[in-house]
């Protein structure tokens, strides 16, 4: 580099490499769908989205039938609310492993990733809300000499 950068103001003036300035291309298959995988705890969600009327199908069942708790449905719809695309995409997904809460989190992660593949301009909004990051928290393993991961057996003084 011929120019020497001494401050952050100088850094702004330097142009970013051409590879970073390229616009991301949408990833869609022949049917116009975008595919992504979402994970949370032990749950894995395979998600396909396409432009549609807002219908969400989970393992061949409607969203309201598969996730009866309103909180879980709210978690799943968060990516659409953040990107202002409610009722604009049809979602077909298969979810395996874990419980309902983990599956809902995996579905949210998968929908967020699929939305960014469908339209890369949605990525900053989803990333700012933290939907693009896989939640690393999992169940802590049980240790020997203990009742559970951290719970000790009852102590008897005598």
Swiss-Prot record:
It comes from the Bacteria. Residues 22-31 have a biased composition (Basic and acidic residues). The keyword Ribonucleoprotein applies. The keyword Ribonucleoprotein applies. GO terms for biological process: translation. One of its GO terms (cellular component) is cytosolic small ribosomal subunit. Keywords: Ribonucleoprotein, Ribosomal protein. GO terms for molecular function: RNA binding; structural constituent of ribosome. Residues 16-37 are annotated as: Disordered. Belongs to the universal ribosomal protein uS9 family. NCBIfam families: PRK00132.1 (NF001099). This is Small ribosomal subunit protein uS9. It comes from Rhodospirillum rubrum (strain ATCC 11170 / ATH 1.1.1 / DSM 467 / LMG 4362 / NCIMB 8255 / S1). The gene is rpsI.
């Amino acid at each position: 580099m011929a120019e020497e950068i001494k401050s952050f103001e100088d850094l702004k003036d330097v142009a970013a490499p051409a590879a970073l300035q390229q616009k991301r291309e949408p990833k869609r298959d022949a049917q116009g769908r975008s595919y992504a995988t979402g994970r949370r705890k032990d749950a894995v969600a395979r998600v396909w989205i396409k432009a549609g009327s807002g219908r969400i199908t989970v393992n061949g069942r409607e969203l309201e039938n598969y996730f009866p708790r309103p909180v879980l449905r709210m978690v799943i719809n968060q990516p659409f609310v953040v990107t202002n695309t409610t009722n604009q995409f049809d979602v077909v997904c298969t979810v395996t492993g874990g419980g309902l809460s983990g599956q809902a989190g995996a579905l949210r992660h998968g929908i967020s990733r699929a939305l960014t593949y469908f339209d890369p301009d949605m990525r900053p909004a989803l990333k700012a809300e933290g939907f693009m990051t896989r939640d690393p928290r999992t169940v802590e393993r049980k240790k020997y000499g203990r009742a559970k991961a951290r719970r000790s057996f009852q102590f008897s003084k005598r």
